[in-house]
A protein has these predicted regions:
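Short, charged/polar surface micro-motifs in flexible loops or helix N-caps
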Residues: 26-28, 37-40, 57-61, 104-108
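Short acidic-glycine-tyrosine-enriched beta hairpin
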Residues: 66-82
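Short, conserved beta-strand element in jelly-roll/cupin
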Residues: 34-36, 45-62
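Short histidine-centered beta-strand/loop micro-motifs
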Residues: 20-23, 33, 41-46, 64, ...
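A short, N-terminal "cap"/entry segment at the start of jelly-roll beta-barrel domains
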Residues: 1-29, 42, 111-129
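Ligand-binding loop in jelly-roll beta-barrel domains
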Residues: 82-108
Length: 129
């Protein structure tokens, strides 16, 4: 199939994996995520990648450069420009479900990380080569 066509809200709400790549193009990538209560992605920076986040369920705290904080809820979006240190923390009572668009792509096509531990292990292996 060329591109991605689907109900992204339903796909996001159905997803229970920490990270799942739905589509990878030459210049952008669509990813769904699910963070457990209290879970966070960890402070990170992508020097060459812009990110768009859309919250579909739950509440999240976005922290930029370890000081600027924004609490967002279902239906809200956040843009994280390349070069911005950021963290996303699930501050709600249940699962945080979101989708994000990376531009350019950030993960290998078809990536599925069932848990944060799986994602951390894959990152470690990727950076050790």
């Amino acid at each position: 199939m060329t591109g991605y066509v689907g109900n992204i809200e339903k796909q996001t709400l159905k997803n229970n994996y920490f990270r799942q790549v739905l589509f990878t193009g030459e210049k952008a990538q669509l990813v769904v995520m699910c963070l457990q209560r209290g879970e966070e992605i960890g402070n990170e920076v992508h020097h060459e990648v812009d990110q768009f986040f859309r919250i579909e369920q739950g509440e999240a705290k976005f922290i930029f450069h370890q000081k600027e904080e924004h609490v967002v809820h279902d239906g809200e979006a956040v843009m994280v420009p390349a070069g911005t240190f950021h963290n996303v923390i699930n501050t709600g009572r249940g699962k945080l479900k979101l989708y994000k668009i990376y531009s350019p792509p950030n993960h290998p096509d078809g990536t599925v990380h069932k848990s944060k531990a799986d994602a951390d292990k894959a990152e470690e292996e990727h950076h050790s080569h």
